[in-house]
């Protein structure tokens, strides 16, 4: 086990999570136009990421030791993948109703947010475990990547 490699991988995972939030916010208006969603509806879709993050942290964090950090990171990857693919391949009106599009986008965004929460659940204790004598220092470095 190479602590430096694991720490760098954790930083990259957090950067990826940060980019998922930034990109989703940048595409909010085009998504609303393409899927015939109101400003309120697209705001609810974007907010689903924060709900997903909170739910993932509340549900999975107490189980992190039982599941293991590797499994939590793999689950984060699966949530990110499913959420991104759900967004990319979501059917647009008139093929489906705007309501259906809304829920597909909402669930996809919830999954991406859950993935972001799962990344946090795994990398924070990992950094503290890798550097037990410098926990605060390395946790600060780790979170310097968050926008």
Where are the language model's segments positioned?
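Juxtamembrane helix-start elements in MFS-like secondary transporters
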Residues: 37-46, 101, 105, 139
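Residue-level signature of mid-helix packing/kink "hotspots" within the transmembrane helices
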Residues: 22, 50-58
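Cytoplasmic helix-loop-helix junction between adjacent transmembrane helices
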Residues: 108-144
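Small-residue-mediated transmembrane helix hinge/kink sites in multi-pass secondary transporters
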Residues: 29, 58-62, 125
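Conserved MFS/SLC helix-loop-helix module at the cytosolic interface between two early adjacent transmembrane helices
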Residues: 55-102
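Membrane-helix boundary and inter-helical linker elements of multi-pass secondary transporters
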Residues: 33-35, 40, 65-66, 97-98, ...
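Small-residue-rich segments within alpha-helical transmembrane domains of MFS-like 12-TM solute carriers
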Residues: 18, 22, 101, 113-121
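Extracytoplasmic
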Residues: 5-39, 124
């Amino acid at each position: 086990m190479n602590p430096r490699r694991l720490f760098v991988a954790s930083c990259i995972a957090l950067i990826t999570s940060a980019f998922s939030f930034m990109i989703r916010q940048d595409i909010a208006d085009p998504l609303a136009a393409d899927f015939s969603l109101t400003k309120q509806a697209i705001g609810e879709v974007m907010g689903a990421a924060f709900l997903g993050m909170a739910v993932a942290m509340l549900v999975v964090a107490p189980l992190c030791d039982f599941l293991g950090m590797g499994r939590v990171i793999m689950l984060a990857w699966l949530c990110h993948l499913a959420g991104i693919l759900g967004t990319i391949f979501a059917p647009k009106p008139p093929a489906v109703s705007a309501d259906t599009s809304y829920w597909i986008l909402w669930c996809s965004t919830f999954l991406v947010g859950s993935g972001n929460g799962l990344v946090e659940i795994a990398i924070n204790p990992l950094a503290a475990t890798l550097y037990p004598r410098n926990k605060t220092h390395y946790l600060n470095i780790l979170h310097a990547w968050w926008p």
